[in-house]
């Protein structure tokens, strides 16, 4: 009997991580199904980015115990686009791959993110939003089973941020990777995710499933109710909810 593929599944069991004696993640247990879009919320220092970096195989010098596995190909999308300034946009996308073989797919992704005319451009000539679109295309060119996104739109202005959120959602619906998004923006998590986790003191304090069709409206009663719940759990006073 053929066993189902684990590609895209994420599994943590009894996972802890500390830096210089400070416990950041504490005995985490978590299962994420392939294709699920999960948002991580929490105050600064709650362990969101540490969890993401553990799944990406980073910070190996940290003291860790337990299991943290992201099955299949993993791509990471950072807040900083991390485009190399001495390479063109297209060459940044294909870096580390068989450039000749993936060039058609790279060109198609640039068209999909609205950068078809920027393939030969230098990163310094791009706006912040354009750089993040290029970074998203670069991540998806790797055909990831798991996409780890660490506040990828945090440095963008409000309008560009909304456009990028819509672009990410459309691209994810087409490619269907598992997505784990670290964000401080409650509305962003509600607009994009299928499941929202709240981290507190290195533990998963809350786990919310969202059963709202896309595109989502912030004035939908269920959206507003969960928004209020999440804001309160993050310490926002009732008068601001």
Curated annotation (Swiss-Prot):
Give the EC number(s) listed in the UniProt record: 7.6.2.14
ABC transporter domain sequence ranges = 10-226
**InterPro entries per UniProt:** AAA+_ATPase, ABC_transporter-like_ATP-bd, ABC_transporter-like_CS, ABC_transporter_ATP-bind, P-loop_NTPase
What's a Gene Ontology MF term here?
ATP hydrolysis activity
Q: Describe its assembly.
A: The complex is composed of two ATP-binding proteins (SsuB), two transmembrane proteins (SsuC) and a solute-binding protein (SsuA).
Which PANTHER family has this protein been placed in? ALIPHATIC SULFONATES IMPORT ATP-BINDING PROTEIN SSUB, TAURINE IMPORT ATP-BINDING PROTEIN-RELATED
Q: What is this protein identified as?
A: Aliphatic sulfonates import ATP-binding protein SsuB
> From which organism does this entry originate?
Delftia acidovorans (Pseudomonas acidovorans)
Taxonomic classification? Bacteria, Pseudomonadati, Pseudomonadota, Betaproteobacteria, Burkholderiales
